């Protein structure tokens, strides 16, 4: 078994780490989403009859530990009863969050398509909306490090499903925000107001920015919860600060605008990655073949949906 390596920050500039380090932890669904009840039921059902005592478990592409939190909260996992459990992810910031919440977890900053573990190291490997981002090689690596009598359980994004539709709606709004060029107009307007510019030039800057605000207001009206509610926050806070600029330091406002732009850009990149990595029938079969190619294993595939009236949102893959 490989030993856990100290967290390092050399990967801080990758887009995956940007999502965890610079943005709010906004997933494709939020804590109130109907999908969450389905996910909780799935994991509770799978682990209710399984004893993990003295077993070794790997949460691959763990992110900030959302799956681990679900399992612990539902008493599916008692960390102190496990022989070892690892959270592996590319993001330093995400793993730091895992370690702060679950000190017993061994965190490993690594490319999940190149796991530094010996063959047949783990009894259980789990993932929720993570492994598919790492490509087919990550499934092959899981097959390699999973014991012959072990169990692999993963929830993966379903192509053309409910979450993908939500991602596409979010992207459409963010592309529209980019077309408005809102942040550039906002910076010019705040600077002009702070410098107490007068005359036609200042009036033009103010009018242009107010038009941009109106356009964002229209986006918010049509999609009030877009980008995890960040677009609504951007509109409300920017408008308030502009109308009450004497109460704020302009440099602090400009810094806030930069951070908001980074956050929305990183959220947009996250949505794009999600669309690119969601599995269709062909890619799902290739993922399963990673386990069956080197020996006979039992495979169970389920399709998860919030209810019969909604599109599926995820594949549930079990190998045992």
What spans do the regions from the language model cover?
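Conserved Class I S-adenosyl-L-methionine
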Residues: 167-197
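Class I SAM-dependent methyltransferase SAM/SAH-binding core
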Residues: 56-114
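Substrate-binding/catalytic lobe of Class I Rossmann-like enzymes that use SAM or dcSAM, i.e.
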Residues: 186-297
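A short, conserved alpha-helix within the catalytic core of class I
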Residues: 133-142
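Class I SAM-dependent methyltransferase Rossmann-like catalytic core
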Residues: 2-48
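Conserved beta-strand signature within the Rossmann-like core of class I S-adenosyl-L-methionine
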Residues: 149-158
């Amino acid at each position: 078994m490989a030993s856990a390596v100290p967290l390092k920050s050399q990967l801080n500039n990758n887009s995956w780490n940007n999502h965890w380090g610079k943005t709010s932890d906004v997933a494709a669904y939020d804590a109130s989403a109907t999908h969450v009840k389905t996910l909780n039921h799935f994991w509770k059902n799978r682990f209710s009859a399984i004893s993990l005592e003295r077993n070794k478990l790997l949460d691959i592409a763990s992110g900030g530990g959302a799956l681990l939190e679900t399992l612990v909260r539902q008493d599916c996992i008692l960390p102190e009863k496990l022989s070892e459990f690892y959270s592996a992810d590319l993001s330093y910031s995400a793993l730091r969050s895992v370690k702060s919440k679950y000190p017993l977890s061994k965190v490993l900053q690594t490319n999940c398509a190149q796991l530094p573990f010996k063959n047949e190291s783990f009894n259980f490997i789990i993932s929720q909306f993570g492994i598919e981002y790492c490509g087919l090689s990550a499934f092959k690596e899981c097959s390699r490090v999973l014991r012959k009598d072990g169990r692999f359980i993963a929830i993966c994004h379903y192509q053309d499903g409910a979450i993908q539709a939500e991602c596409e709606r979010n992207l459409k709004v963010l592309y529209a925000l980019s077309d408005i060029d809102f942040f550039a107009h906002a910076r010019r307007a705040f600077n002009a107001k702070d410098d107490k510019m007068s005359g036609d030039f200042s009036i033009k800057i103010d009018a242009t920015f107010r038009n941009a605000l109106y356009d964002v207001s229209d986006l918010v009206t049509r999609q009030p919860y877009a980008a995890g509610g960040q677009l609504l926050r951007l509109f409300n806070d920017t408008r308030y600060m502009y109308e009450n600029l004497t109460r704020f330091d302009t440099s602090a406002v400009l810094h806030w605008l930069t951070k908001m732009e980074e956050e929305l850009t990183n959220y947009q990149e996250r949505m794009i990655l999600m669309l690119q990595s969601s599995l269709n029938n062909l890619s799902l079969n290739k993922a399963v073949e990673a386990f069956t190619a080197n020996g006979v294993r039992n495979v169970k595939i389920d399709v998860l949906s919030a209810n019969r009236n909604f599109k599926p949102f995820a594949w549930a893959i079990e190998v045992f």
